Amino acid sequence: MFYCCYLLVSEKAASRSVYIGSTPDPARRLRQHNGEIKGGAYKTKRSRPWKVACFVHGFPTKIAALQFEWVWQHPQSTRHDDLRQHSRVVSVKRQTLLSCVRALGVMLCCEAWSRWGLRVAIFDDAVHRLWLKERLPSNCIQLCSFDDVESLRLADYGGDAGWLDTQRKKRAQLSVQAQCSICVRAILLPCFFLCCPFPDCRMIAHSTCLAASFLQEAQDDEHILPISGTCARCKRLLSWKLLVQASLSPSDEDNGAVGDTGESDDNNERESS
């Protein structure tokens, strides 16, 4: 479920090296980069020791995180028009801490990612100062200690490590002779359906019906997928991203739809010094 894109900064004297990668386990990945355990990227060996300056989390799937990572590493090669308009981002030939922070802030405002509800955990004061100086979006950042990583990981599960298992059991129970709470038609498996994640609510709906309901509520006729909406039964506010995450089966996770124990390929990662 949890998968983040991180920015490393070298703590080596006189080094200005930075490094962008992705992982489901930031603490373990940092130990790998610093040579404490096997599996660190070869490209980061010369600039050890490293620290995690910040990471972005809240991605709907692992694939989404990997796509975001690639653009963050290669902003000059992006095909996103709203990102290409920022010459200070796409004209960079050599990555620095400033260019990485600036690119991240701009990306979060782009149409491709602004509706994902991504969050930035900042662990380094220098990154925080740059963020404020560049007047980047402040509603998505959180200044915290790297010791808080586990709580951030759990936040992307809905706050409970067993949350997904609970949701899967609930879906299995509700899917038996189910009726859509919106169109009132039968939900015939294996169609894609969504359930309210709250334990005391039995709302179940076709994904298309629920998306249309949320978009109508938001008076949004420009997008296909919503950000959030009100449950048709319990009237609580629901996050579309969490609804979709709760609907993914273990096989979806195995196929890479959700973060697993693997890391991003070294060929996709980039270090600049």
Swiss-Prot record:
Root EC class: hydrolase
Quaternary context: Forms a heterodimer with slx4.
Domain called GIY-YIG: residue spans: 1-82
Principal location listed in the UniProt entry: nucleus
Cellular localization per UniProt: Nucleus
Gene: slx1
Family indicated by similarity: Belongs to the SLX1 family.
GO molecular function: 5'-flap endonuclease activity; crossover junction DNA endonuclease activity; ds/ssDNA junction-specific dsDNA endonuclease activity; zinc ion binding
Segments of this protein annotated with the region Disordered: 250-273
Any one GO BP annotation for this protein: double-strand break repair via homologous recombination
Record protein name field: Structure-specific endonuclease subunit slx1
Enzyme Commission number(s) of this protein: 3.1.-.-
Cofactor(s) needed for function: a divalent metal cation
A GO cellular component annotation in the UniProt record: rDNA protrusion
